[in-house]
C-alpha cells in the first residue's frame, strides 16, 4: 500500500471518539511488543492498544483495551480501515485485475468484491477476515472470534491516476459485552499472497 490509516471509533456518552485523534504515550516491552496508552484524568480509566510482532509468521497481534470506561457500548466500537494501493508494475492494467478486497464468513468459502468496478458491500454474516490484496502482497485483518454481523461494510474503488491502483475500505464491528474492561483482539497479516 501507498498510504493508509485505521482506528477505532466509538461514542463516549454523546461524544464520538476516534483513536486517530487521541494522544498516546508508548511503552516498549522487549524487542517485539509496544503498548500505546491514551490516559484520562482518572488513572483507573484508559484506552490501551498493544502490538506484538510474531517472530515466525507475517502476523502482528493487536489488542485494544478499554479499562474503566463503562459508559461505552462495546457493540458500537467500529474498526475503520482505509488503504490506497500503490502501482508498482509497468503493466498497470494487470495490477488492477489482481487487486481486490476479499472476505470470509465463518460458515463459507472466501469471496471478493469486483476487481474491475467500484463496489460497496454490507457484510451479512459473522466474518472471520477481510483482506486488501494487491498483485504480490496482502494485508488482512483477522478476528478469531469473528467480526459482528451487525453493520460491517467493505468497499473498493479503482483509481484513475497512474500512481495508484485502488482505494480499499472496511468498517468492522465486534460482539462484545459491557464491563469494567473491554478487550478487542485481532491480528494483521502483512505478507505475500500464497
Task: For the regions a language model picked out, list residue spans one by one.
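Soluble non-transmembrane domains of integral membrane proteins
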Residues: 1-194
Amino acid at each position: 500500500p501507498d498510504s493508509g490509516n485505521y482506528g477505532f471509533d466509538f461514542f463516549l456518552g454523546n461524544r464520538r471518539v476516534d483513536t486517530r485523534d487521541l494522544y498516546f504515550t508508548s511503552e516498549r516491552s522487549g524487542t517485539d511488543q509496544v503498548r500505546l496508552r491514551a490516559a484520562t484524568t482518572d488513572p483507573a480509566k484508559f484506552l490501551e492498544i498493544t502490538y506484538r510482532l510474531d517472530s515466525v509468521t507475517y502476523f502482528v497481534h493487536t489488542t485494544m483495551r478499554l479499562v474503566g470506561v463503562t459508559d461505552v457500548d462495546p457493540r458500537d466500537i467500529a474498526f475503520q480501515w482505509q488503504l490506497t494501493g500503490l502501482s508498482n508494475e509497468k503493466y498497470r492494467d494487470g495490477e488492477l485485475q489482481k487487486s481486490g478486497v476479499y472476505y470470509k464468513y465463518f460458515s463459507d468459502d472466501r469471496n471478493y468484491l469486483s476487481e474491475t468496478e467500484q463496489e460497496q458491500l454490507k457484510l451479512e454474516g459473522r466474518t472471520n477476515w477481510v483482506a486488501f490484496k494487491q498483485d504480490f502482497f496482502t494485508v488482512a485483518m483477522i478476528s478469531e472470534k469473528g467480526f459482528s454481523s451487525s453493520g460491517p461494510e467493505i468497499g473498493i474503488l479503482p483509481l484513475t491516476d497512474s500512481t495508484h491502483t485502488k482505494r480499499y475500505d472496511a468498517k468492522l464491528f465486534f460482539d462484545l459485552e459491557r464491563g469494567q474492561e473491554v478487550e478487542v483482539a485481532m491480528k494483521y497479516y502483512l505478507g505475500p499472497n500464497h
